[in-house]
Each structure stands twice: as structure tokens, then as C-alpha cells.
């Protein structure tokens, strides 16, 4: 099994020979530890730094740098909102974001993982939705670097006061999104 352990920057991958590709949907590109089958049929394992989304076009390598694999975003069922009225598209994005929906925003369209309830909301706002198969590359969150999708909640500093509540949170409910804020934990 090939152990893919490192991400390559664009500069690092320039001039390297591509071994094969790895096509994954978004639900698997958010994982850092994963057994996969490369597009050429070889078995591989991802052993990457936690909390970073794999983006289409990004290259991975093994410890020796001998194997270079390019990630491809798989086509998956998505809802795409195309709109020439940028104010309407902005309003739709606002309402989707208000529901903590991972959202891909591009010039003239927005895309999210298909959900008929969200589709009905978009139509109710005056938009139109096309359900299609397409790669899904959501925006990195405001508290995340553009390189990844996870978050870290470091809380090592002294507040100068005490609390009778915990500053920890659980990732047990994958449907909940946690956003760390100083002294509070807001969950959806």
C-alpha cells in the first residue's frame, strides 16, 4: 500500500512526474486518515495533517517524495443556482450561509450538496436550481485557512478569571458545526 503523507505546494509539484490521480467526493476529501483506491487501481492510505480539505488539483506524495498523486474532485449530486441578478444571488448565498451550508461560490453561480429542502428555499427566494453532477469545491470557512476546512480550538492562555463551564466541544455529531469564539462555543 502506498502511504501518502505530504501535500505538495504548486511550486513543489512543478516538474515532478505524476504517478496517477485520486478522485474523491467532498465527504472523503475532508478526511485525513483514509484507505483509498487510486484511479490506476493501486491501494493507498492517506496519512495527512488533520483539518485540511483536499482540493481538486492538489498533489500528494509519500515520505520519500517518489510518488506524486493529483487529487481530483469527483462529480457528485449538487444543486447549482445560476443567476444574472447578483443581488438575488447574494441574498440566496446569505440565506444558505445562515444555515451553515458548505457553499461553492463562483462568478454567476453558487453550488451546494443537493438537498431538496434547500432547493425549495432557493426557489421561494426567487432563484432557480438545477440538480446536476459536478465537482464540489466549497469555500473555506471564515475561521479556516484557504488550504483547509477544519478548525483548531487552542485555549492555552489565561483569562484572568475562572469559569464553571468547559471550553471543549465534541465532534461526535457530524451534522453540527462548531465555531469557536472567545469564551463561547456557538453550534448550529
From Swiss-Prot:
SUPFAM superfamilies with a match to the protein in the record: Urease metallochaperone UreE, C-terminal domain (SSF69737), Urease metallochaperone UreE, N-terminal domain (SSF69287)
Keyword Phosphoprotein: no
Recorded GO CC terms: cytoplasm
This protein's record includes keyword Ligase: no
Biological role stated in the UniProt entry: Involved in urease metallocenter assembly. Binds nickel. Probably functions as a nickel donor during metallocenter assembly.
HAMAP family: UreE (MF_00822)
Stretches with biased composition (Basic and acidic residues): 157-172
Chain spans, region Disordered: 142-174
Gene coding for it: ureE
Annotated GO MF terms: nickel cation binding; unfolded protein binding
Annotated NCBIfam families: PRK13261.1-1
Organism encoding this protein: Tolumonas auensis (strain DSM 9187 / NBRC 110442 / TA 4)
Subcellular location: Cytoplasm
InterPro entries named among the record's database cross-references: UreE (IPR012406), UreE_C_dom (IPR007864), UreE_N (IPR004029), UreE_N_sf (IPR036118)
Family membership noted in the UniProt record: Belongs to the UreE family.
Primary location: cytoplasm
This protein's name: Urease accessory protein UreE
GO biological process, one term: protein-containing complex assembly
Keyword set, alphabetical order: Chaperone, Cytoplasm, Nickel
